[in-house]
């Protein structure tokens, strides 16, 4: 999935080692003791966990961590679920694991969580992560469903929405994929639309988490998907590939804009982050599934790949062991593997993702565009008027600095040409030309239309230090800005609540009084 974004810890530190392996082991025998272990623990406010565990109900457990931004954004949502009558047929609790998988130590976690305000959220602390380890939890957030008879019925790795959670409680085997959020997609059937000239190549270079994240950062790459290629069985699982010798290689399907990048460009980026002389091993990962290879679907590409390999060989004394073969088969990896380092910025990564930001020899970056408008024109209505005209969510977000749920707003995946204005005052804030899919769950921009249209403030909520972004004219809370955006566009990610914005389509800008800004829209 295409999310050209941050991986802030990965980018800053060259990728941190989480567990020293690309993916988890199979759930171990200790999983059978989960219900008993859970009942002996206490919550963050020192209440017995057994208070939340009714014996005649299944138990839905959410595993999360203080360092996981997606987890933090979902705390309020999970608290509401825990109080919602729709969830009354199950015990709904959350588990934090101090001292495990980079979580804070127990005392530090307790002190940190005491500074938050989720009084009705059941947070059980499992010091050392005994339960998480027995269930092989290595992705945050993750969910576990424990049946009435104390059996582990299902593990779900990644975020789930309300419909998925309820379906899981009703049926442990429910098809959760059919209940994903659906988002607006641009109309590609318009006569004036341009069809992108895309090509696809399949690259194997060790653990696919890092390789997928690396290519997602490269300008001109449209999509990067983790999967299993050139094996001997159909529809393999991770466990099949890792433990049952299926012959597949962990591979990333890279789709790129051929008008921006050539296959040779892609291969140059590829060779930057793999050791082409290492047989069945990249980073800390060893096995035939971690072999290196370039798999093509167009026979004409074999010669291009061969030429690139010949050029690369000149850099090494040892022979290259990179496969140059036609693609025999490719199967998407499980959902929790997709965009893994977006979901888990602390996750294992065997390559230096920062190399994606280094232009290839002879390549240049786009120069920034000009800016400018008078923000003093826009006024903030009275509070009474705002309560009358705004929705409850819009009011709470803009006036009380609330945060909408991740992936909940239609603007997150809206990419029509136009501008985004302050829903309170109408002040122009952001352009579709600067919008990108960061994968964080909120509309993301590389810059405002004009730097003077927003103000920045220190924000110490969640016991963290972040930079809040507010509108200039109406002082509306918009979101936050982070230094993990696309490097070639300034390196900033303005992470903005959709509820703070109003979208003005390009074709309506003249009528709405924003015609002078049409040049800011692509």
UniProtKB/Swiss-Prot annotation:
Residues 199-354 are annotated as: Peptide methionine sulfoxide reductase A. Has an important function as a repair enzyme for proteins that have been inactivated by oxidation. Catalyzes the reversible oxidation-reduction of methionine sulfoxide in proteins to methionine. This is Peptide methionine sulfoxide reductase MsrA/MsrB. In the N-terminal section; belongs to the thioredoxin family. In the central section; belongs to the MsrA Met sulfoxide reductase family. Its EC number is 1.8.4.11, 1.8.4.12. Keywords: Disulfide bond, Electron transport, Multifunctional enzyme, Oxidoreductase, Redox-active center, Transport. Residues 383-506 form the MsrB domain. Possesses 2 methionine sulfoxide reductase domains (A/MsrA and B/MsrB) and 1 N-terminal thioredoxin domain. The domain B exhibits a thioredoxin dependent methionine sulfoxide reductase activity; the Cys-495 is probably involved in the reduction of MetSO and in formation of the sulfenic acid derivative. The regeneration of Cys-495 is probably done via formation of a disulfide bond with Cys-440 followed by its reduction by thioredoxin. The gene is msrAB.
